[in-house]
From Swiss-Prot:
Cell location: Cytoplasm, Cytoskeleton, Microtubule organizing center, Centrosome
InterPro entries referenced in this protein's UniProt entry, alphabetically: CFAP96
Keywords assigned: Cytoplasm, Cytoskeleton
Name used for this protein in its record: Cilia-and flagella-associated protein 96
Alphabetical list of PANTHER family matching this protein: UPF0602 PROTEIN C4ORF47 (PTHR31144:SF1)
Chief localization: cytoplasm
Family to which the UniProt record says this protein belongs: Belongs to the CFAP96 family.
Gene from which the chain derives: cfap96
A Pfam family this chain is assigned to: CFAP96-like
Cellular component GO terms held in the UniProt record: centrosome; cytoplasmic microtubule
Length: 311
């Protein structure tokens, strides 16, 4: 351990006495504890163990389950139905059985048996013959149909071909000129003008100043000297001038009150660095849950525990 501070082993905090955490299993000494027992005992390859049966199709080659029975692939359902109908037909010895008497009509609601009027023809369920419906025929045409849609083909539509009419370029400008000249010709004289001096509608502004303004005052520009200012006499030394005194400097006078000598506060004469007592060290601790799992499921009984997976 170095003279000052902690060692690297103490800083890590792993090299210390392990905690007394147990789940009730017996203690075996490290000397008698086997090392890598699974490498030379029991099976060398550990499989996944037994799997519980599942109704899913995962793990098979086909996505859907197919039934496979003996000679099922060679059966034809159509052929089997035909053979069954032939066997049933062979059981018929003669013709169909017909009773000696005909069907008796019921005497109840909806029948006309025993009534005076008998059945009404209009209420009969038989289909009434109807006359053959003749179609009215197509409409007759007064003129043969026109060919084409009419776009780009003259004299094909119902209306006649449009006759040519000239359209001068400056027609709108000429019409405007004619309207302006006709309007000016209707005017009798020129524009109406008054010979009076124009006046304002309201009183004059009393604050209006018609006289010319005085010239603006010129601001004197401050002159900036490039050369720094130097006083006429040199600067005085500290302490002032000593001319006229007996001594050039004042005589020394002792302090009336005695000054205490300060001592340096050093409690440790050897000047050693203070190290506090080390606190608790951190240690990697396994969880009790993981220890219980390792105890319950191990290399000896892993294949007897049913798997939860479906494949």
């Amino acid at each position: 351990m170095p003279p000052d501070g902690k060692s690297d082993m103490e800083r890590i905090g792993v090299f210390k006495e392990m905690g007394y955490i147990s789940i009730g299993d017996k203690y075996t000494s490290f000397i008698y504890r086997p090392f890598n027992d699974s490498a030379y005992k029991n099976k060398q390859m550990l499989l996944g163990g037994t799997k519980s049966k599942c109704g899913l199709q995962t793990g098979y080659f086909d996505t859907q389950f197919k039934r496979i029975f003996e000679r099922e692939a060679f059966t034809d359902p159509v052929r089997i139905d035909r053979q069954y109908r032939i066997l049933q037909a062979k059981k018929n010895i003669g013709k169909a059985f017909l009773p000696s008497n005909g069907e008796k009509t019921t005497c109840g609601m909806g029948t006309y048996y025993g009534t005076f009027g008998g059945p009404i023809q209009a209420m009969s369920a038989l289909q009434i013959p109807r006359k053959q419906n003749k179609s009215a025929g197509k409409n007759f045409y007064t003129n043969p149909p026109k060919e084409g849609s009419g776009y780009g083909c003259p004299d094909i539509t119902l209306s006649k071909m449009v006759s040519y009419s000239s359209d001068p370029y400056d027609r709108a400008k000429e019409m405007l000129k004619r309207e302006i000249t006709a309007h000016k010709s209707m005017l009798k004289g020129g524009a109406f003008r008054l010979n009076l001096h124009p006046n304002e509608y309201f009183d004059g502004n009393p604050y209006k100043f018609d006289k010319p303004l005085p010239p603006p005052k010129k601001i004197e520009e401050k002159k900036h000297f490039a050369v720094p200012f130097k006083p006429s006499s040199p600067s005085k030394k500290a302490g002032g001038m000593k001319a006229g005194a007996f001594d050039s400097y004042p005589t020394y006078s002792a302090e009336p009150y005695g000054t205490k000598k300060t001592k340096s506060v050093v409690a440790n004469n050897e000047v050693k660095i203070f190290h506090p007592s080390p606190g608790p060290k951190s240690t990697p601790i396994k969880s009790i849950i993981s220890l219980n799992v390792n105890k319950a499921v191990n290399s000896t009984n892993y294949n007897r525990i049913p798997s939860v997976m479906s494949f």
